[in-house]
Amino acid sequence: TKTGNFKPKNGEACGSERMDVTADCFHAKGDNWHWFEKTELGLNQIIFKHDTMITFSRGLDGFFVFENSKSDSNCLLGDIDGNTSRRSDQQLPTVAEADYLEFMSVEENNHRFLLEGNVSVEGNNLYLTCDKIELLFVKDVNGSSRQIGKINTMEAIGNVMLRQGGRKSYANEMTLSVPEGVAELRGSPDGKTLARVVDEEWGEAVGEKIILVKGKRMAKVVGGKSGRPRVVLPPIPNLGFDKISGQKKSKP
């Protein structure tokens, strides 16, 4: 940043102009920033209150890529090296934007990133929008002290829309567990809004909870108080049978 108000004794600093932060695994920038050395929740808290963007260089490691399919990356090509985008053995970055961004060190080896307001996340075969999202990174105990680790969980809340190649998912909330390899979509607590997955191949699934499995083009639909789960299959093609079985055509 070009200017800022620094208070070393209080362990804080702030500024209204744009600030860039570069770490081992991410690059963040935004306006109207505030830094705290220590808070009740963690250490080295940085807040951007306007026009924020953060790029995670290691991304989600292809979590949303279907098996036996080509990568349909929605990454911003300007943020990655051209050769990297062509190599399947390289991870593509995950880029997130929001009105508000906050990140800090929490507990030991963990880092939390919170984004709120007009949130969008783009990555390898992934485009996600929602009102609020929280990312938790967990570092390997044997890793470098500078590293923030890898994405462990992702919690998206409010008007969640997840777009992948040939599939769109909608929910009130979504919880992604990278270690377990599953994403859980949930409807609203009052049951008025259900989770929904629309797939070009097998149709539409609706339920109180839908579970997506890493690398698989499948969904497990769970019903609840709002009713039984529902699956709408694509139209069945004409199989060639006559409308009236056994009816013979009359000769002219």
Each predicted region: which residue ranges?
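Mature-chain termini and adjacent capping regions
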Residues: 1-252
